[in-house]
């Protein structure tokens, strides 16, 4: 995470939490000649268009006041979607039992890509039951990316 995105996160999270929203992810970069700041928000009952509009208004006002971004940009606010990223320790426990894809920074047992059922987070490690039939514990600092995999069977259980 860059210094700028870390600063934006520090400004935005305390604003969203009392409103009942979780900042799932934040992306900032240049695309097609313009800068875009994307916020992905969630809450237990899900996200609708009204939520995105409300968060966009309050975040836009805050960023206009604090002015941490040195040039013009577009602000986009959306749901993380069905295959949301897992970033925080709490995410790995909240979605235990769900199907996930995980990529590590360095190979573990000769591979960097894993898919299976998330068992949770414990003692600094993400635990999962792999599709190959064995369990794996990966230190959180070795996880490059992790995200839910949409599985209709999981959705029907909820």
Curated annotation (Swiss-Prot):
CDD domains: YlxS_C. InterPro entries: Ribosome_maturation_RimP, RimP_C, RimP_C_sf, RimP_N, RimP_N_sf. Gene3D superfamilies: Ribosome maturation factor RimP, C-terminal domain, RimP-like superfamily, N-terminal. Coiled coil: none annotated. GO terms for cellular component: cytosol. It is found in: Cytoplasm. Transmembrane segments: none annotated. Disulfide bonds: none annotated. GO terms for biological process: ribosomal small subunit assembly; translation. Belongs to the RimP family. Required for maturation of 30S ribosomal subunits. PANTHER family: RIBOSOME MATURATION FACTOR RIMP (PTHR33867:SF1). This is Ribosome maturation factor RimP. The gene is rimP.
């Amino acid at each position: 995470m860059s210094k700028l995105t870390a600063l934006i996160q520090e400004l935005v999270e305390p604003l969203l939490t009392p409103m009942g929203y979780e900042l799932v992810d934040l992306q900032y970069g240049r695309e097609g000649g313009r800068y875009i700041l994307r916020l992905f928000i969630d809450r237990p009952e899900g996200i609708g268009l009204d939520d995105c509009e409300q968060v966009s208004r309050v975040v836009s006002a805050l960023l206009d006041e604090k002015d941490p971004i040195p040039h013009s940009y577009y602000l986009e606010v959306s749901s993380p979607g069905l295959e949301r990223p897992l970033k925080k320790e709490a995410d790995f426990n909240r979605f235990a039992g769900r199907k996930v894809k995980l990529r590590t920074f360095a190979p573990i047992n000769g591979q960097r890509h894993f898919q299976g059922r998330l068992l949770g987070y414990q003692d600094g490690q993400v635990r999962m039951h792999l599709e190959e039939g064995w369990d794996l514990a990966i230190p959180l600092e070795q996880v490059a990316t992790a995200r839910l995999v949409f599985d209709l069977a999981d959705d029907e259980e909820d």
